[in-house]
Amino acid sequence: MKLLGLLLLVFTFMALAFADEKDCIARGQKCVGENKPCCKGTTCMYYANRCVGV
């Protein structure tokens, strides 16, 4: 039973990690005019049109 709980926990964290990637723009990608925010830990530099680390 402990193994099942552990596997469920691992799969839940994996699903959350993969879902975050699809809903945001990765570092170094163009961000101006896109309908998505930059990923966590990055911000859109409008003059450079790129997501950069904070």
Swiss-Prot record:
Pfam families with a match to the protein in the record: Toxin_30 (PF08117)
Tissue-level expression: Expressed by the venom gland (posterior main gland) (at protein level).
Keyword annotations: Calcium channel impairing toxin, Disulfide bond, Ion channel impairing toxin, Knottin, Neurotoxin, Secreted, Signal, Toxin, Voltage-gated calcium channel impairing toxin
Task performed by this protein: Binds reversibly and blocks P/Q-type voltage-gated calcium channels (Cav).
Origin species: Platymeris rhadamanthus
Gene Ontology MF annotations: calcium channel inhibitor activity; toxin activity
Domain notes: The presence of a 'disulfide through disulfide knot' structurally defines this protein as a knottin.
Disulfide bonds: C24-C39, C31-C44, C38-C51
One GO term describing the cellular component: extracellular region
InterPro entries named in the record: Assassin_bug_toxin-like
Keyword Phosphoprotein appears in the UniProt entry: no
Family listed: Belongs to the venom Ptu1-like knottin family.
Protein name: U-reduvitoxin-Pr1a
Signal peptide: 1-19
Keyword Zinc found: no
Subcellular location: Secreted
